[in-house]
Amino acid sequence: IVCHLIFAFVVPATGSRLIAYITIIVLGVSFALVPAALWPSVPKIIEERVLGSAYSLIFWVQNIGLCLVPLLIGSVLDSSNAANPAVVAAKAEIEQLKAQGVQAPDVFIPYNYTVPLVIFACFGVAALLLALYLKALDKKKHYGLELPNIKK
């Protein structure tokens, strides 16, 4: 959540590459730790007889997200930058070059990514709320989510 908000607000305001590098490293470590914490909890919550179905459902939801979230972000990026003069000018330059029969060079389109990054932060908030719910459920039903899998 914090990383996406830093990318949305702090990095554009400061222009600091150091902050951007540190933020992307923290985000990468976070992405690596989530599966390490998530996958071992599944067999503690789900009955063994339906464990395979549970894993397939998890993969299905992840793949739907991988399919639909880029479409959502692309649509939001286009609509939130429709009135951005720099984006409009860059797109007009590309269209003008195409109309002249010239292959458009790699023209930098200066999109404002604030809204998509806030959406990612909202996904993070939703995940945090689900994690807190799971922790409360663990406390109530004693799944042992924070206990080691290997017992001595």
What are these model-derived regions, one by one?
Residues 104-105, 109-152:
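Multi-pass alpha-helical transporter architecture, strongest
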